[in-house]
């Protein structure tokens, strides 16, 4: 796979990747067979895929929306399915009362979750759903359990049939078709969820020709979340999507990046700061923010740019911290 072979020789990678970053996209006629092959021919077909047992599915614009924001307030959803992804991560599916309803989320946005332990204050945490916004009936959350993390521990302790309070959506970075020529997603751990939401939105839209580069750091190989989904994107759109994986504790046979996401790696795989209309997104644990981009001052204040990205010459306007 490209992502694993790429680290074997940094200089050829750099040359090849710069070419990838600046090459013109294929014409619409050459892309048409690809979109037809994967079934991406518009919202109607995407919705039909989820309702194949029925006649023609109603258009997305006609479906009710569950999350409306504003003064809607908190409401609860029932946990309907649990999938164990690895030793510390689960995919939790929460179903809507109306199975034809859509979430109402836009890309990129998150939801607030809440639960109140006995004799303690309510715990509120944001999560980015990984389910498609155009899929009716449910939302999926990918949740990694953290020691002494009250919300993640609560979510991992839940059983099918139990309920959880939600509120939202919280819009983080409103995406528009072809908003940028090239975006770069630098993620660590469960910071991958908003990155996947953004990448999925781009590649399911035939009109969006944005190029996407993913740099994803984890501790062990089994910690790489949504790897199957990203490999599918890489195989389907090799001209527009590249993924690079870095492990702090790799297995002996690992041929990808080792250690932490480094300045040398980012200098090699990211587009140069002088390129037009690029955007770099960062999401991960506090230590990664500090090293890569600097931390946010608050949910509404991006703070100053620092760390590796500043050292490489990127501007504050070219970087967004989830």
Swiss-Prot record:
Domain FAD-binding FR-type residues, every copy: 72-176
EC number in record: 1.6.2.2
A Pfam family reported for this protein in Swiss-Prot or TrEMBL: NAD_binding_1
Catalysis performed (reactions): 2 Fe(III)-[cytochrome b5] + NADH = 2 Fe(II)-[cytochrome b5] + NAD(+) + H(+)
Residues engaged in binding FAD: 179-214
A single Gene Ontology CC term: mitochondrial outer membrane
Enzyme type, top EC level: oxidoreductase
One GO term (biological process): ergosterol biosynthetic process
Location (main, coarse): mitochondrion
Entries under PROSITE patterns matching the protein: FAD_FR (PS51384)
Molecular-function GO terms, alphabetical: cytochrome-b5 reductase activity, acting on NAD(P)H
UniProt keyword annotations, A-Z: FAD, Flavoprotein, Membrane, Mitochondrion, Mitochondrion outer membrane, NAD, Oxidoreductase, Transmembrane, Transmembrane helix
Cofactor(s) the protein needs: FAD
Membrane topology summary: Single-pass membrane protein
Gene3D superfamilies tied to this protein: Nucleotide-binding domain of ferredoxin-NADP reductase (FNR) module, Translation factors
Entries under InterPro entries matching the protein: CBR-like, Cbr1-like_FAD-bd_dom, FAD-bd_FR_type, Flavoprot_Pyr_Nucl_cyt_Rdtase, FNR_nucleotide-bd, OxRdtase_FAD/NAD-bd, Riboflavin_synthase-like_b-brl
Transmembrane stretches, start-end: 31-48
Cell compartment(s), UniProt: Mitochondrion outer membrane
Signal peptide start and end residues: none
Domain of life: Eukaryota
Family: Belongs to the flavoprotein pyridine nucleotide cytochrome reductase family.
Protein task: May mediate the reduction of outer membrane cytochrome b5.
Protein name, per record: NADH-cytochrome b5 reductase 2
